[in-house]
Every structure is written in structure tokens, then in C-alpha cells.
């Protein structure tokens, strides 16, 4: 949300700098198109308000429900329970097989 607010303010600053940097003839055309720029600003504000109203969760991958958060936690708890249910093996056997970091170490491959 802060990103969108900063983006809008940045765009307005860039637009105002662009308008003041134009020669006099171009400034007149900018003033004549003031109605169009107001419509553009209103359109931008409507788009941003639409993003911020309720669909901002869809920007980050959809709505996050409590079930989505609980499922990985339950999976981790099940994995821990399964790990603890195994007979207690020595540390060497519990490690992943085939991790031979040194040439003299034991591997269970």
C-alpha cells in the first residue's frame, strides 16, 4: 500500500516537472489539455482505490485463509511425529544417505 502511494506521488512529481520544463508554446497546450489530465488523474485514482479496496490480496497470490496457514504447520507436526516414532538411530544413520563430504567419511549408500 505504501508502494502504491509513493508511486502515485512520484508520478505526479514527474508530471509536474515535465510540465514546467516545456517551452511556452507547449505549456499552452498543457493548459488546454487540463481537462484531459484531470480525467487521467481521476482514472488513476479510481484504479488505485480499486486495487486498495479488496483486491490487494490478489496481487500477492490470492487471498490467504487461516486454512492455508494451518496446513503447512500440520504437515510439519506430522513429519516431526513420524520422525520421533522411528526407533532412535545413531546420528550417523539419521543423516541423509550419500553425503560424503570427505573421502574418509562413512556413507550408507
UniProtKB/Swiss-Prot annotation:
One of its GO terms (biological process) is adenylate cyclase-inhibiting G protein-coupled receptor signaling pathway. The keyword Disulfide bond applies. Keywords: Cleavage on pair of basic residues, Disulfide bond, Hormone, Secreted, Signal. Residues 1-16 form the signal peptide. It is found in: Secreted. Disulfide bonds join 98-109. Belongs to the somatostatin family. Somatostatin inhibits the release of somatotropin. This is Somatostatin-2. It comes from Protopterus annectens. The gene is sst2.
Amino acid at each position: 500500500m505504501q508502494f502504491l502511494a509513493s508511486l502515485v506521488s512520484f508520478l505526479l512529481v514527474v508530471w509536474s516537472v515535465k510540465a514546467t520544463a516545456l517551452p511556452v508554446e507547449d505549456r499552452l497546450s498543457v493548459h488546454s489539455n487540463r481537462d484531459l489530465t484531470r480525467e487521467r488523474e481521476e482514472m488513476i485514482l479510481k484504479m488505485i482505490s480499486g486495487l486498495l479496496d479488496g483486491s490487494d490480496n490478489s496481487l500477492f497470490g490470492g487471498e490467504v485463509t487461516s486454512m492455508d496457514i494451518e496446513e503447512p504447520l500440520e504437515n510439519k507436526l506430522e513429519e516431526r511425529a513420524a520422525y520421533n516414532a522411528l526407533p532412535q538411530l545413531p546420528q550417523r544413520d539419521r543423516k541423509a544417505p550419500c553425503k560424503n563430504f570427505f573421502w574418509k567419511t562413512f556413507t550408507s549408500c
